[in-house]
Design a protein with these regions (language model features):
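Feature captures the catalytic ectodomains and active-site-proximal regions of enzymes
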Residues: 1-413
């Protein structure tokens, strides 16, 4: 038996007026998912227990079998683990987004956060932004004085590590939760280190806003990459062995460092797929084949994560969100099943949205999310479809960190 955990990041939503009161899941054409739903079990679960905010760092840690109340120590250490960055005692890791602020000569505090990702900047463009900052004497000196180092990545998601960083009382705000709002309303606060981070963010804008790199982006009709935003700090994190907890081995397939990092800290293989971007242009076929190839080995577990529905929602792209959900069905799940069926492989599936990402706000929501359990060749007689309404009408799993026990069959709904 093979076990497949499929996470459609942020695909659950609330009813959308533009869709006639339907959710994107209800509007999407997902025949393979609904085939599973009709023969499986559809229920609901809270993946982000209070008092934690709704976010993938809590939700996916929970879905992957770790109670966040026991194991969560910040988002960025898990992202750092995906890059092989090992935090020392006293080190603090931060997520550092390359962002797009309003293209205006207004004071920094009045500039609106236009894009949490500078228009999904990636590749050499993302690396160039980091190079520009590192080569600027004033910014470089401020980083050195703060005891900070930035680790470049070819996406908008960067990692900054600070030696002996003071996070007692520090408050940092996720930029994707405040799109369209003035930056000055959400700057770091809470302690002296907040002023250090505040200064770095303002310096970055000063360096980047009129740089020839951004002049070229404007000329090309792209969102200027004219700022950075530090958030999601955390200290060194240790997670229990996945094999030790469940007796299963396998890997994680994702275009997002957070998910790979959680897998790595649990002793799972991080499977890198070329072109897996964490956006709707991700390499669907590569991720699909990597899943099949993994399950053709002695490994019996695969976590397949698709970030695209979440990013489309943050970007205000409702058609893109629906398209991403449909491609999850047609370009990932359907061909995976076809190849496993040809191989004669038995499999069980857990499909879930890690959290809701709301079209109305372009932000996350901590309401219960639907999940689907399916086993090849079995028929529960449910006869329904997979969406938020059928999930809420179905059984409740008490805690997100128990979900994998239902996938592995050690618990039943």
């Amino acid at each position: 038996m093979k076990y497949i955990l499929i996470i459609g990041d942020g695909m659950a939503d609330n009813p959308v007026e533009r869709l006639g009161g339907r959710t994107p899941l209800q509007a999407a054409n997902i025949p393979t998912i609904n085939f599973m739903a009709a023969r499986g079990t559809v229920g609901h679960v809270v993946t982000c227990p209070k008092p934690y905010p709704a976010g993938s760092e809590i939700a996916i840690l929970s879905i992957m079998g770790c109670d966040p109340r026991k194991y969560f120590n910040g988002r960025s250490p898990m992202e750092a683990a995906a890059s092989g960055i090992h935090l020392q005692h006293g080190d603090v890791a931060y997520r550092c987004n390359i962002i797009g602020l309003e293209d205006s000569d207004a004071p920094y505090d009045e500039l609106k956060i236009v894009s949490h990702s500078a228009g999904s900047i990636a590749g050499e463009d993302a690396l160039e932004v980091v190079r520009i900052l590192q080569e600027d004497p004033e910014f470089s000196a401020a980083m050195q004085a703060a005891g900070m180092v930035i680790y470049p990545h070819p996406v908008f998601r960067q990692i900054v590590v600070q030696a002996n960083g003071d996070v007692d009382g520090l408050k940092l705000i996720p930029p994707h939760d405040h799109l369209g709002e003035a930056a000055g309303q959400h700057m770091p606060s809470g302690n002296d280190n907040a002023a250090v981070i505040d200064n770095l963010m303002r310096l970055a804008h000063k360096v980047l806003k009129d740089h020839p790199f951004n002049q070229a982006r404007r000329a090309a009709g792209k969102i200027p990459a004219n700022g950075i935003w530090l958030w999601a700090y955390g200290m060194a994190t240790e997670l229990p062995s996945f094999e030790g907890q469940y007796g299963h081995t396998g890997g994680v397939i994702s275009g997002v460092a957070l998910v790979h990092g959680i897998g790595a800290l649990r002793g799972l293989e991080m499977i890198q797929v070329p072109g897996a971007t964490g956006e709707i242009d991700t390499n669907f076929e590569g991720k699909m084949q990597a899943t099949v190839d993994l399950l053709r080995t002695d490994a019996d577990f695969c976590c397949l994560h698709l970030e695209a529905p979440d990013e489309c929602t943050h970007n205000g792209d409702l058609p893109g969100k629906i398209q991403a959900i449909e491609w999850l069905d047609s370009r990932l799940i359907k061909p995976i099943f076809e190849q496993l069926d040809t191989d004669g492989t038995d499999y069980r599936v857990l499909l879930i949205s890690d959290h809701k990402t709301l079209t109305a706000t372009r932000g996350h929501d901590g309401d219960p999310v639907p999940f689907l359990l399916y086993e090849k060749g079995k028929d529960t007689g449910f006869g329904g479809v997979f969406n938020e309404d059928t999930g809420m009408a179905g059984p409740e799993v008490p805690a997100g960190h128990d979900l994998l026990e239902y996938l592995f069959g050690t618990k039943s709904v």
